[in-house]
A protein has these predicted regions:
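Active-site-adjacent substructure of cysteine-protease-like catalytic cores
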Residues: 112-167, 197
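Solvent-exposed loop/turn segments at secondary-structure junctions
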Residues: 38, 138-141, 173-175
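Active-site-adjacent structural segments surrounding the nucleophilic cysteine of cysteine proteases
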Residues: 1-87
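Residues that form generic nucleotide/phosphate-binding pockets
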Residues: 70, 74, 91, 95, ...
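Hydrophobic, well-structured mid-protein blocks that either form specific transmembrane helices
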Residues: 75-111
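Conserved catalytic or regulatory cores that recognize and/or transform ribose-phosphate-containing ligands
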Residues: 45, 49, 99, 140, ...
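Noncatalytic regulatory segments and standalone regulatory/sensor domains
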Residues: 20, 145, 155-198
């Protein structure tokens, strides 16, 4: 069984691309803000919100970067990174409040939970048509080295036999990962997921 959310492209990029930001701090540490920007565009396209102040008919990097700078104060890049789920919820929640959007609620799903429970939560979100922000801190598997201390979105899954593959979106591209391998980091300090209600 496979399900992927409809998504969007920005001048050929699959979603926003942090590495192309003109602003140095956003380029280096703006991953949380970028996932929030992507969620806003997604919600406008598919959930009838009104969060992205530019045209949705033809998404451009220039306007996306401008939007990213509007999001930056809420999910500000910092020395330690946005390394807790609650910081993300507080920052993005403040943005939503300031933009008169009370339809979207968020709750944290700790990376300390069992992978089986995390898979269930992920599948439920995707089945509801909702992207899932994911925070990965350190990981023992070097497959995920470009995703360490990083926020990205999960936008699809594929289930077969005992395996669950997940579609991760970041850096303007998408990747398929084994969810158990992604979730079981081998480190005591964990990230986790953000679950939306809308």
């Amino acid at each position: 069984m496979r399900k992927e959310l409809d998504y969007f492209k920005i001048e050929g990029d699959y979603g926003g691309n942090q590495e192309l930001f003109p602003d140095l701090m956003m380029k280096l540490g703006g991953c949380a803000a970028v996932t929030a920007c992507d969620c806003c565009i997604y919600f406008d396209l598919y959930k009838e919100t009104n969060l992205y102040p530019y045209s949705l008919d033809r998404l451009t990097r220039k306007e996306y970067f401008q939007f990213g700078m509007k999001m930056k104060p809420y999910l500000r890049p910092r020395w330690t990174g946005i390394d807790k789920l609650e910081i993300y919820i507080d920052g993005f929640g403040e943005f939503l409040c300031d933009h008169n959007c009370n339809r979207i609620k968020m709750r944290p799903f700790s990376g300390e939970a069992e992978a089986t429970n995390a898979k269930t939560a992920l599948v439920e979100q995707i089945d509801k048509g909702l992207p899932v922000p994911c925070l990965l801190l350190n990981h023992k598997n070097k497959t995920f080295k470009d995703f360490e201390w990083h926020w990205f979105l999960l936008t699809g899954y594929e289930l077969f036999e005992e395996k669950c593959m997940v579609k991760a979106v970041s850096y303007g591209e998408w990747y398929w990962f084994d969810f158990d391998e992604l979730w079981n980091t081998g480190h005591s300090r964990k990230g986790g997921l953000i679950l939306f209600e809308i």
